[in-house]
């Protein structure tokens, strides 16, 4: 897996390392690998400054040069020194500023190729991450033929197109790939790797013997921190190289650590050439000169660093870091350095130095092996404890899950039984509802039939209702007319009754007067009998001359009766009463005047008058009855006329209605023939054709 792929994946929960170094590594151990890169000087720096004499004493190390190392997780690991020789140019500028970002130097005489030229960037580096900065593409070669960066770093190998192990693309920012996990379950204090612990740098005393120290008036402490900033970065713990099976020790890119192979269980990694160390040593004796343009710039620096993060312990880890020795420093002004600063070392010294460095590397490899074995034992112990804890947790989880499964099964069984009961109830309810629905459908059909029959009967009853309405209207008119006639008749009857009452009163009065007259007549008859007897006696005594016939009152009454026939009843009665009174007065007077002679005649006249009055009264009653009969006949004739008129009016109304119906029917037929639609009556509202019914007999109420 490529570093870019590892960086892009981010943190992983479970990513066990390769088993050829640590066996089975638990996920709780965080492994990190930090590789440092050399500090390159300004690309415009003259490479002849590498032969400036180094100072006599070294100042205190810059705190930024402390390099952290990652221990292998072994307590009380043996610390071992490592001497490494490296040459690098100081980041000297005209003002002694700090160098730029660090980058690795690849051992070729030409400039570093671009990022796309290295085919080894796809190499699998498991659980490895580089924390160095971006690459700088400006390199140049010094007089020894080595590639020197902007901060003085030179490569140790030449002519290789492969990128160094710490090479990283600029578009992939550094990320820390961790493997998660915790060691909570372990009761004992476990051995864990300590990442990024400070390391005490050590000076390379063997390199001081190669060239005599010279000072140019400026100690190292005053030269600025630019020369001390060379490729010291935080280191990481060693990690397996993934599926390739070979693990390598990561160096800062300038020392011989990248030249020597690291420990591998398969012993398949070959030894890299020792060109880095030889090139660094060969450059020591080469004369150099300073650039004339820079004032106060530092000379050629030799900073050697080694990644010793693989032999650190739990309490503290130590790493051997090469000292930074200045071969020369520039003066404060524009003055240059002497060209022949030091003499080249002898081959025996070089061989001795190489043997010492080789011995140091062997010691380092042995220490790394011991630390690896101890770390493997610790890791195995931790893994066993973790496995035991995991087994206990698994057993507890199984037990808990089995109990939960049983509970869930019981709940599911109870729920299933409840659901079955609900299903049975719902099925019964469904059957009952279906039966009720069928019954309701039957009832609905019956009701629809009844409604249809009722609508049909209603349609049949409509013309009858119309006829009945017309008859009711006719009867109402007749009743109103008869009521009016009744009112008139009642008024006439009341008038007649009043007249009858008046006549009855007059009759009573006449009867009373008649009784009186009869009584008077009886009394007069009695007196007449007595008078007649006395008269007969006296007639025999009187002479015949006195017995002349005189005018009787009867002769006077006859013309009066002829005149009275033309008068009314009341007038007649009044006249008769007056006549009777006058006659009575006359008779009384005659009786008084004539004495007994005219008494009989007066009585006769009175009797005749009363008989005439009775005959007149009878004739008046007969005339009144005839007038009543005539009035009744006239009223009946008028009634018949009114009834006939109502009949004709009703018949005319019926004929008018029939004509209107016929006209509407003709209009509908013509509209249907012309294409116009008329709204059809709905069911139950169809109007049947009205059949003209003849009013055979119309009865009216008789009064």
From Swiss-Prot:
GO BP: protein homooligomerization; regulation of dendritic spine morphogenesis; regulation of postsynapse assembly
GO MF term (any one): PDZ domain binding
Compartments, record wording: Synapse; Postsynaptic density; Cell projection, Dendritic spine; Cell projection, Dendrite
Tissue specificity annotation: Detected in brain, with highest expression in brain cortex, caudate putamen, cerebellum and hippocampus. Detected in neuropil (at protein level). Detected in brain and kidney.
Segments of skewed composition (Low complexity): 96-107, 251-268, 304-324
Main location: other
Residue numbers of Phosphoserine PTMs: 346, 348
Compositionally skewed regions (Gly residues) per UniProt: 290-299, 325-336
Region called Disordered, residue ranges: 1-22, 40-190, 204-347, 665-703
GO cellular component, one term: glutamatergic synapse
Keyword Hydrolase: no
Biased composition (Polar residues): 205-218
InterPro entries, A to Z: LZTS (IPR045329)
Effect after changing residue 701 to A/S: Abolishes interaction with SHANK3
Consequence the record notes for mutating residue 703 to A/G/V: Abolishes interaction with SHANK3
Keywords annotated in UniProt: Cell projection, Coiled coil, Cytoplasm, Cytoskeleton, Phosphoprotein, Synapse
Family membership: Belongs to the LZTS3 family.
Function summary: May be involved in promoting the maturation of dendritic spines, probably via regulating SIPA1L1 levels at the postsynaptic density of synapses.
Subunit structure comment from the entry: Interacts (via C-terminus) with SHANK3 (via PDZ domain). Interacts (via coiled coil) with SIPA1L1. Can form homooligomers.
Protein name: Leucine zipper putative tumor suppressor 3
């Amino acid at each position: 897996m490529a570093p870019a792929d590892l960086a892009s994946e981010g943190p992983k929960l479970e990513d066990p390392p390769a088993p050829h170094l640590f066996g089975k590594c638990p996920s709780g151990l965080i492994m990190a690998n930090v590789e440092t890169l050399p500090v390159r000087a300004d690309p415009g720096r003259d490479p002849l400054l590498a032969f400036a004499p180094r100072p006599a004493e070294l100042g205190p190390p810059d705190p930024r040069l402390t390099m952290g190392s990652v221990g292998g997780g072994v307590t009380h690991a043996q610390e071992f020194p490592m001497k490494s020789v490296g040459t690098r140019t100081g980041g000297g500028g005209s003002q002694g500023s700090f160098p730029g970002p660090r980058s690795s130097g690849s051992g070729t005489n030409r400039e570093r190729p671009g990022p796309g030229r290295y085919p080894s960037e796809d190499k699998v580096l498991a659980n490895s991450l580089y924390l160095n900065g971006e690459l700088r593409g400006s390199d140049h070669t010094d007089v020894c033929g080595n590639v020197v960066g902007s901060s003085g770093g030179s490569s140790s190998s030449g002519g290789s197109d492969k990128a160094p192990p710490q090479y990283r693309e600029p578009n992939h920012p550094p990320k820390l790939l961790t493997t998660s996990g915790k060691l909570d379950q372990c009761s004992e204090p476990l051995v864990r790797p300590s990442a990024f612990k400070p390391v005490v740098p050590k000076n390379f005393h063997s390199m001081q013997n190669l060239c005599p120290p010279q000072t140019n008036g400026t100690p190292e402490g005053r030269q600025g921190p630019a020369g001390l900033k060379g490729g010291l970065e935080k280191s990481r713990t060693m990690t397996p190289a993934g599926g390739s099976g070979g693990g390598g020790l990561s160096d800062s890119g300038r020392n011989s650590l990248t030249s020597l192979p690291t420990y591998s269980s398969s012993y398949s990694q070959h030894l890299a050439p020792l060109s880095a160390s030889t090139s660094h040593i060969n450059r020591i004796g080469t004369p150099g000169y300073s650039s004339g343009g820079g004032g106060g710039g530092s000379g050629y620096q030799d900073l050697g660093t080694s990644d010793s993060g693989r032999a650190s312990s739990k309490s503290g880890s130590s790493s051997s870091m090469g000292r930074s020795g200045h071969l020369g420093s520039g003066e404060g002004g524009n003055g240059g350095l002497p060209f022949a600063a030091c003499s080249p070392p002898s081959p025996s010294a070089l061989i001795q130095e190489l043997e010492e460095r080789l011995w140091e590397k062997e010691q380092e490899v042995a220490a790394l092996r011991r630390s690896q074995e101890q770390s493997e034992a610790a890791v195995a112990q931790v893994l066993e404890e973790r496995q035991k804890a995991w087994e206990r947790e698994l057993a507890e989880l199984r037990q808990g899950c089995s109990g939960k499964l049983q509970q869930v099964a019981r709940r599911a069984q109870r729920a299933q039984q409840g659901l079955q009961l609900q299903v049975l109830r719902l099925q019964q309810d469904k059957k009952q509802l279906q039966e009720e629905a069928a019954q309701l459908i039957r009832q609905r059909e019956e009701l629809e039939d009844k409604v249809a029959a009722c609508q049909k009967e209603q349609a049949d009853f409509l013309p009858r209702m119309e006829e009945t309405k017309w008859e009711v209207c006719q009867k109402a008119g007749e009743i109103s007319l008869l009521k009016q006639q009744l009112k008139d008749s009642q008024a006439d009857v009341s008038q007649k009754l009043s007249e009858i009452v008046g006549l009855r009163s007059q009759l009573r009065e006449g009867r009373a007067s008649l009784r009186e007259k009869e009584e008077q007549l009886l009394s007069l008859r009695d007196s007449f009998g007595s008078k007649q007897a006395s008269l007969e006696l006296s007639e025999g005594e009187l002479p015949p001359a006195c017995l002349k016939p005189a005018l009787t009152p009867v002769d006077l009454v006859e013309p009066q009766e002829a005149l009275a026939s033309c008068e009314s009843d009341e007038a007649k009665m009044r006249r008769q009463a007056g006549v009777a009174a006058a006659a009575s007065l006359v008779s009384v007077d005659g009786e008084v005047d004539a004495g007994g002679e005219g008494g009989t005649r007066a009585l006769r006249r009175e009797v005749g008058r009363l008989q005439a009055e009775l005959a007149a009264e009878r004739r008046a009653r007969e005339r009144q009855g005839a007038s009543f009969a005539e009035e009744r006949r006239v009223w009946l004739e008028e009634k018949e006329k009114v009834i006939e008129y109502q009949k004709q009016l009703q018949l005319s109304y019926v004929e008018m209605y029939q004509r209107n119906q016929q006209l509407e029917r003709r209009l509908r037929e013509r509209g249907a023939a012309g294409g116009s639609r008329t709204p059809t009556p709905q069911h139950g509202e169809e109007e049947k054709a009205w059949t003209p019914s003849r009013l055979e007999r119309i009865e009216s109420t008789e009064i």
